[in-house]
């Protein structure tokens, strides 16, 4: 018998109200309610965790960590002893981060930190001798202008980038490797778009395992259009007469992209060879991944994509000769191909059609319809599946060459969960390392030789961390228990979170996370806030520990008491390729339909105040909120749009064209996906709020400005529309207390919406849209 949607929701609520207590879950039997300061401003109610730098020594299981007093220590799992290598009083002033050399002889410090983009920053770098504790600058004349620095695996040299040029340091000698770096030429570091959309990091250089060679990418931005971001205050208390202007080479849809080249540096004599990756036209080529597939320096794998990222080719570079060959290729024109950055070298194996000399690597692919683990030979041939099924591998976490195992996390139990497994690439046997019959969200960090690991239970209850040996099933010890947090939370009455699946008319099932207010009673009426992100491949509904954040606050404040629903619509991640690809070439359409359908189902519940259902999203979620309002469905009474895209022509090419393809091939799609229809904005009962930072280098303020102009030009009235800019704030909206103001403003609008008793209608609202005089 098939339950109706309403029945499923009622069952879910009943289960949430009487859910069994999980170990380590606060019983929430107290009377205190979460406050704004506790959830938005303070991190006092957040779980603690430790992160370590595993190091390769004679004994596997050594790692480096930083004590609360700032001192740097090495701890050995085998001996259970720790040693201080840099005492707190010897830490350089204004230290931001550190990296110990592989030979443990020195520490590389980054100081004088200045944020650049999402991942990148500028800093000064110092080298500290572990034995003498003396510190010397990496470069004598540095002025907080070094972009990146990294130890070689041997620990006797450093590659670094300054002024967009690649340099090396060896025993105090600094050598310039490139000299033509500048505003349009980047060596060893990505430009803005490669950092944000392709590499997801601040470096584009890779030492070979034996430190003989260094592969690095060069990005040429000649011809890439410039977008200027203005900073009106520029970190000053009083505004300068003229704003500082930052010119960013930012290719938008169908504009010129940066070109990219692969180079290999011979570290012994500082000679550089450029390796042609000519599998696509240079103007179309995107290099998505570079990985050494060798224990020495013989072979390099380069994953290349075409411009719209629906074709990929893995090129193997024979470094001795410079010759290249296409080992594997993929057609993804039914949607797109994600750059998963997962190539991991395994070693020589005698498998399939290969011989004992064939080198193999593992990688993730969804060519079966679900993302799974495969063995690939550098000689080519069909990939060998290591996992299969209607679930997905989410990440490769370690390779154990000695035991011939790949460790990975997957959604085998449920798409909202993560469990840890190993698979033998010799026998193909899969072994769970955690109880995969119990709902949980795990993450893990393995030692250098994969003999030990730190296992992090990340939810749904309060997180903790334990240390394990791969040879034992019981933990060696607990690293963080968060016992104090559990005890503290016993003082509180907390919102109740539950999960369920909502079937939509097309037959797909959507994951939903529901948060019920403190003291929930089915005899009362509650307003609802939908909190989507909804972008391609993203996931918001997961069984991680749900931070006691703004959403928890609005479910706790007695003057708000909102139910929250987070719905992962079609196009989101970890549900298979078909589910993801449904949104290709039509962003915003199906996602909005799904949110509207879910809201209409929620409105049928007896305890939902159907006249007060709001929706709030940030970035893609802000865009989705706009598309939901555009439908003019009447399902939502308030829209809150934070840092939204409003027209995909205004966003960067590499993200947008991955899903929408080019403007010339999908002009109608771009017209449809832009937020241009205004009736829904005119008719939404409680109005809407648009928030955006003027210094947003990612989703430019231009998006909010253009949307605002469209709405005003089409007669949206002032009582419906509120716009808030945040001077100089980037996409995170944190500059000068902006984040606190932002959340206070959201809370104020939600309070106003909850108490809105009737339509707000000024006299001019009764006139035609030409009311402006």
Swiss-Prot record:
* Protein name (record): Probable dipeptidyl peptidase 4
Reaction(s) catalysed by this chain, per the record, are: Release of an N-terminal dipeptide, Xaa-Yaa-|-Zaa-, from a polypeptide, preferentially when Yaa is Pro, provided Zaa is neither Pro nor hydroxyproline
Gene for this chain: dpp4
Q: Which Pfam families match?
A: DPPIV_N, Peptidase_S9
Signal peptide residues on this chain, from the entry's feature table: 1-18
Q: Which GO terms describe its cellular component?
A: extracellular region; plasma membrane
Gene Ontology MF term list: aminopeptidase activity; dipeptidyl-peptidase activity; serine-type peptidase activity
Keyword annotations from UniProtKB, A to Z: Aminopeptidase, Glycoprotein, Hydrolase, Protease, Secreted, Serine protease, Signal
Which EC class does it fall in? hydrolase
